[in-house]
């Protein structure tokens, strides 16, 4: 481009297609049946761990920040018994700080 104002003659458009790109992939995926069998075998090998995993539940706990009283959400995955321990800690001396107050300290 020459000059202060571009003109149509200054703009060069080259709309030639690039060399063709092969978009085909020769990769083969494993069948999902094998994965399902592995998962079943995994559960049969460790039944105690499988039972424990089923007992864990996700809980949302809303706790006010100890500095600014902004509500902080805690996502906890635990058993009911462990949730009671967390509840006792939060009712006692344990405090929670929001990210803004934590970064300013």
Curated annotation (Swiss-Prot):
One of its GO terms (cellular component) is host cell nucleus. Residues 1-45 are annotated as: E7 terminal domain. Disulfide bonds: none annotated. One of its GO terms (molecular function) is DNA-binding transcription factor activity. The keyword Glycoprotein does not apply. A motif (Nuclear export signal) lies at residues 83-91. InterPro entries: Papilloma_E7. Residues 30-40 have a biased composition (Acidic residues). It comes from the Viruses. Pfam families: E7. Highly phosphorylated. Homodimer. Homooligomer. Interacts with host RB1; this interaction induces dissociation of RB1-E2F1 complex thereby disrupting RB1 activity. Interacts with host EP300; this interaction represses EP300 transcriptional activity. Interacts with protein E2; this interaction inhibits E7 oncogenic activity. Interacts with host TMEM173/STING; this interaction impairs the ability of TMEM173/STING to sense cytosolic DNA and promote the production of type I interferon (IFN-alpha and IFN-beta). One of its GO terms (biological process) is symbiont-mediated suppression of host innate immune response. Keywords: Activator, DNA-binding, Early protein, G1/S host cell cycle checkpoint dysregulation by virus, Host cytoplasm, Host nucleus, Host-virus interaction, Inhibition of host innate immune response by virus, Inhibition of host interferon signaling pathway by virus, Interferon antiviral system evasion, Metal-binding, Modulation of host cell cycle by virus, Oncogene, Transcription, Transcription regulation, Viral immunoevasion, Zinc, Zinc-finger. A zinc finger (unnamed) spans 65-101. It is found in: Host cytoplasm; Host nucleus. Plays a role in viral genome replication by driving entry of quiescent cells into the cell cycle. Stimulation of progression from G1 to S phase allows the virus to efficiently use the cellular DNA replicating machinery to achieve viral genome replication. E7 protein has both transforming and trans-activating activities. Induces the disassembly of the E2F1 transcription factor from RB1, with subsequent transcriptional activation of E2F1-regulated S-phase genes. Interferes with host histone deacetylation mediated by HDAC1 and HDAC2, leading to transcription activation. This is Protein E7. The E7 terminal domain is an intrinsically disordered domain, whose flexibility and conformational transitions confer target adaptability to the oncoprotein. It allows adaptation to a variety of protein targets and exposes the PEST degradation sequence that regulates its turnover in the cell. Belongs to the papillomaviridae E7 protein family. The keyword Nucleus does not apply. Residues 29-48 are annotated as: Disordered. A motif (LXCXE motif) lies at residues 23-27.
